[in-house]
């Protein structure tokens, strides 16, 4: 699908945002079960567009619709390059980018792309910490287990301050705690309205516990089933 046509049509129809997934490769042989079914991985997962190139095309033909990754596979990317990609996309879209992040579920893919699958959320957290330094500091540096670099310049900076919103994807056991610690929102995958309601209560408690503004952590539901009656139940 043309990434210039679809976003423009979505904006004309009044949609709030458009999201691009990421899987740069899909192993021919994989022992990682597909999360939605626990079984075979759909063949479409080997045909995803590149999200940042697609969103750049979308930015060029739109002016209002928000542009988002749902999600960026952070352990598979170099944060020094990713920081620039996000900043430039946010700049040229006049602050419309939403940075949805995830750690991945396919062991073989993550490993081939240089990620540490068994500790992928720790690696993701470090990368996001490094990205925030690069986005907000004139001279940025980071020293961690997975990423370690001396002071560097990384310009331009994002339009959104202090940086584009960082939304954590998935339904991992500790995802809400992670959102409260170093995220700006949650991207639940295939969640029911009841689960969303209960999770909102937990997020509100975590906001208070960590001194964050009430209601500052967002929830954006994605990856839902094609049941057309389902969206009504969220309203």
Predicted regions and their residues:
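Active-site-adjacent structural elements that line small-molecule/cofactor binding pockets in enzymes
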Residues: 1-234
């Amino acid at each position: 699908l043309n990434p210039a046509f679809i976003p423009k049509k979505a904006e004309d129809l009044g949609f709030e945002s458009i999201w691009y997934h990421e899987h740069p490769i899909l192993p021919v042989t994989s022992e990682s079960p597909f999360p939605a079914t626990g079984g075979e991985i759909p063949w479409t997962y080997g045909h995803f567009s590149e999200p940042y190139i697609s969103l750049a095309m979308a930015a060029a033909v739109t002016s209002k619709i928000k542009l988002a990754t749902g999600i960026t596979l952070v352990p598979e990317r170099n944060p020094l390059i990713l920081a620039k990609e996000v900043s430039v996309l946010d700049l040229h879209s006049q602050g419309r980018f939403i940075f949805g992040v995830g750690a991945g579920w396919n062991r073989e893919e993550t490993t081939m792309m240089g990620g540490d699958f068994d500790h992928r959320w720790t690696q993701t957290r470090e990368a996001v910490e490094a990205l925030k330094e690069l986005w907000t500091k004139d001279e940025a540096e980071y020293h961690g287990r997975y990423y370690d670099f001396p002071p560097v310049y990384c310009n331009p900076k994002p339009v959104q301050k202090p940086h584009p919103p960082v939304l954590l994807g998935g339904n991992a056991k500790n995802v809400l705690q992670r959102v409260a610690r170093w995220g700006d929102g949650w991207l639940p995958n295939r969640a029911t309205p009841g689960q969303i309601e209960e999770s909102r209560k937990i997020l509100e408690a975590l906001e208070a516990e960590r001194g964050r503004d009430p209601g500052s952590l967002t929830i954006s539901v994605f990856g839902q089933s094609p049941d057309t009656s389902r969206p009504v139940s969220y309203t």
